[in-house]
């Protein structure tokens, strides 16, 4: 009898914990209704109507040399193309520090449409990421590359950001390729510190920040 009671108690405990875990997962993922993560980019792209409502999409990409990982991030910001371009190319502005994922940021050099910046992220304290960003105003494209991958524990990290006018707003398409130990785990980890959290936060931060700064960048 005692053995049966013990088995029933264990079964009840496991069921209760399983339900609790499921509830937590539903709650956590329910906090991100305006975002979508999928395996592959559909042929017709994300829903433009949902993009206009503020939804952001992330899709997995296969790197060109089949090494490492890649992603494409797509979202829309409520700002004209010209104003948003000025916002994205203002590499030395203090407003970047209002992003909770950035703890330090400085411009090392900025001339001839090539900017070298150093950024320390909250998720990797003490590590300076030195980025080179090449601005192409005629095509509204930004090409970026991590210049010190070894110091950041990476093999490589590069990509580009393409801006496109959509009515009175701007569509942002960011593509990146990277590789480092644990890249697959980082890419699929859904909470703080993972790729999805980082990208969704960056997109949301821009969507909320640029409308407040339109007077500065128009």
Named regions from a protein language model:
Residues 4-23:
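Bacterial N-terminal signal peptides that target proteins for export
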Residues 21-33:
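Bacterial N-terminal signal peptides
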Residues 36-111:
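Hydrophobic ligand-binding cavity/cleft-lining segments
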Residues 64-68, 93-153, 178-179, 204-218:
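Glycine-rich portal/gate segments that line the openings of hydrophobic small-molecule binding cavities
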Residues 68-74, 141, 158, 169-173:
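Intrinsic-disorder/low-complexity, polar/charged segments enriched in Ser/Thr/Lys/Arg/Asp/Glu/Gln
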Residues 72-75, 105, 128-135, 158-165:
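Hydrophobic/aromatic beta-strand elements that line small-molecule binding cavities or substrate pockets
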Residues 78-82, 109-112, 134-140, 162-171:
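A short, structured loop/turn motif at beta-sheet edges
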Residues 148-200:
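Beta-strand/loop substructures that line and gate deep hydrophobic ligand-binding cavities in soluble
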């Amino acid at each position: 009898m005692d053995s049966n009671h013990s088995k029933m108690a264990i079964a009840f405990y496991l069921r209760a914990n399983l339900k609790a875990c499921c509830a937590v997962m539903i709650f956590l993922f329910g906090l991100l209704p305006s975002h979508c993560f999928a395996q592959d980019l559909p042929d017709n792209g994300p829903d433009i109507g949902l993009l206009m409502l503020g939804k952001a999409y992330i899709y997995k990409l296969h790197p060109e040399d089949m090494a490492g990982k890649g992603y494409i991030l797509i979202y829309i910001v409520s700002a004209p193309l010209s104003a948003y371009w000025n916002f994205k190319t203002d590499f030395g502005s203090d407003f970047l520090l209002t992003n909770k994922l950035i703890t330090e940021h400085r411009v090392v050099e900025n001339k001839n449409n090539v900017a070298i910046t150093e950024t320390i992220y909250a998720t990797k304290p003490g590590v300076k990421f030195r980025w080179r960003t090449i601005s192409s105003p005629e095509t509204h494209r930004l090409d970026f590359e991590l210049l010190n991958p070894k110091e950041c524990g990476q093999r490589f990290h590069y990509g580009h950001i393409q801006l496109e006018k959509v009515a009175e707003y701007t569509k942002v398409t960011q593509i990146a390729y990277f590789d480092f130990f644990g890249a697959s785990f980082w890419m699929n980890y859904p909470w703080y510190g993972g790729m999805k959290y980082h990208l969704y936060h960056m997109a949301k931060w821009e969507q909320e920040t640029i409308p407040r700064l339109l007077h500065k960048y128009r």
